[in-house]
């Protein structure tokens, strides 16, 4: 789940536009507790705002053994911010966006630092994406183990490219514009069968 909490964070609180209520970090943590108790959620991205470091520390302490807590806005692929998170115990995973930090050297440095401290890495697109396959190569080459991408053509191009390099692929993706989830079973990468790409409506 990508909460993008920075989008509705202000002065250490969070505005839920559905009813105009303001919630604390603890309130959101309790909501996440309900979600993971009732649904098979294994990863939450940007669960709190990028400046809510104390909240992130609390969230991580509470859910570290149950959830992958991914910092995107929190870290912005920046090693200085990642080191701050490591020192504070904030998050346990980082979203890696090569074209956000600006160079391959800085991308590699971020992955190395994360791995040295037991943080998981998720190679990622940014908000707009093409069929370019560079992040697929980086995901395999740097051994991130996870990749995040969107849009059907973009997804397929990266799956095909991953199939050239990886041994096995497990893909979990976002919803498309029609509200459908694009999913893929675990498959052996060699000779990926595109018929395994499937759509499943969520009621």
Label the predicted regions.
Residues 1-152:
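Catalytic core of soluble alpha/beta enzymes
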Residues 153-203:
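Toprim catalytic domain recognition across nucleic-acid enzymes
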């Amino acid at each position: 789940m990508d909460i993008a909490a920075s989008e509705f964070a202000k002065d250490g609180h969070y505005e839920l536009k559905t009813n105009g209520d303001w919630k604390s970090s603890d309130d959101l943590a309790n909501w996440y507790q309900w979600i993971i108790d009732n649904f098979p959620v294994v990863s939450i991205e940007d669960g709190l705002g990028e400046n809510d470091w104390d909240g992130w520390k609390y969230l991580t302490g509470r859910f570290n053994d149950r959830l992958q807590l991914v910092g995107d806005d929190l870290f912005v692929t920046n090693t200085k911010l990642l080191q701050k998170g490591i020192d504070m115990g904030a998050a346990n995973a980082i979203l890696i966006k090569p074209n956000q930090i600006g160079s391959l050297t800085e991308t590699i440095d971020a992955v190395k630092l994360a791995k040295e401290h037991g943080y998981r890495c998720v190679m990622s697109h940014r908000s707009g994406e093409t069929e370019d396959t560079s992040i697929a190569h980086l995901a395999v080459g740097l051994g991130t183990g996870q990749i995040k991408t969107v849009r059907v053509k973009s997804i397929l191009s990266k799956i095909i490219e991953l199939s050239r390099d990886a041994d096995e692929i497990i893909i979990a993706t976002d919803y498309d514009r029609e509200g459908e989830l694009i999913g893929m079973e675990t498959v052996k990468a060699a000779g990926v069968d595109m018929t395994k790409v499937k759509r499943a409506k969520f009621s």
